Amino acid sequence: MKIFRPLSLRFLPVFLCAVSIGCLAQAVSSPSPQHLFFRVTLGAQQATPVSGRLILMIKPGTKLEDVQVGEFHPARISIAAKDVSGWKPGESVDIHTDNIAFPAGFSKLPQGDYVVQAVLDTANKFSYYGRLPGDIESDPTFLAHWTAGQGDEPKLTLVKTIEPKTRDWLSPKMTAAEKQGATDSTKMFDFVSPSLTQFWGRSMHIRAWVLLPPGYSDHPKERYPTVYFTHGFGGKMEYNKFTAAMLYQRMAEGKMPPMIWVLLDESSPRGTDEFADSVNNGPWGQALTQEAIPALERQYRMDAKPSGRFLNGHSSGGWATLWLQVTYPKIFGGTWSTSPDPSDFHDFTGIDLYAAHANVFRGPDGTPYPIIRDKGKVMATFKELTQLEDVLGHYGGQVRSFDWVFSPRGSDGRPEPMFNHYTGDVDPAVVAYWQQHYDIAYRVAQQWPTIGHDLRGKVHLYVGTADTFYLDGAAHKLDAVFQGLHANEQFTYIPDRTHFDLYRIKKDRVGLLDEIAVRMYAVARPKAHWKATQTVAPAR
């Protein structure tokens, strides 16, 4: 699930099973397929043949602007897709818009005005990142008074390759001194992991931005507590640099105590790796704790002990940091995880995966399961999100990302899907594997006799009671497990807060982060009694 920016399932954060093209078509096709085609031509400006997933998007209206896909109100835009290989400049491809389509075939669209656009996803990353540099797109095209199946076949041409955009990661609200300080204090960390490289058979990197606190170079003998942060679903290395600037400014202004922040990138074409050891993604937890962290502690003046190593993340990043703390309780001194993805699979965004005849699309009474809400209103169902992701591609969507982390590997080398993408029926064998390996509440209960001594008092979880992705339910269940063990863990439920405004205190949209940082520092420096020079608002 995602952090701070409402974009893709977090979006959720927060979230990858493999389904054949035939299965995708079955999942989203009309019962009696029509034969409505759109023709897309690869423009002559393209010098070489290209391959990828050709995505066609159409929406009602007359405004000529890019047609964007989103998890909120997903059915407002219709999408069709087709894989292409070795597509040569000047050649045309026909997309059968009732074959692989969402929410239904284009032949079902009513007569009206529409804007249509085509995008070639050249790197198979659209489901996670959206449009990327290197993708090729058409201009938005207006279809006036269009009636499906009547008149000439609509035609589009891919004429523009998306170019990289340079964005200033330094806030315009920063002073000149703060901008210079943030620039000098933000360091790239690019570490080749031996264990991940061995798993994948190619060079695999753990990447992060390391933010040094103001005054780091002026105090060469000083060591600092270190926070390991990771983003939510949809995040990436670029966004972490914006976070670094924000953190530096808050430390420089005296809102936060001086600490080193390691802003870890957990994104991949498959979704988020969660820094969990997985038979599909590889040993990310092992690589971080046994390889990357020792390398960082050799390079920077970190406390390099459990009482000075902390974790923070939101959404999918919240699950990752919660997982790391529970799995490696002797390494980390505490996690402050916010709105984590489901930590108890009895409540997987409101669905009990362990129930008899469990189905993620509908409840026992046939009511569709929601997955996104806003102000009490359902914005999307689990079925809609699944079918949308299936059309966009085989990799990287929130739903499939869970499979890549949690599932056993199938005979085809891909993760086994937790549920049937056509019917929604849950596979009990796969869920049993999920439980044994990744249900945090289950693992805590089972392993408490061995991990309790090192874990007690180290879990701090925050979630809104109106979480956009229904993640408060699983938090309550994990809380109940800890209470049953008489553990001293802190769970904070912030009334009426959603996934996206959880950190807001009064007018400060990330004020909660100051509070978290102060509490971390108190663990690392219990005698320091650090106080903000600007008031840190109390928890609500």
Question: Where do the protein language model's features map onto the residues?
Answer:
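N-terminal secretory signal peptides that target proteins for export/translocation
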Residues: 1-9
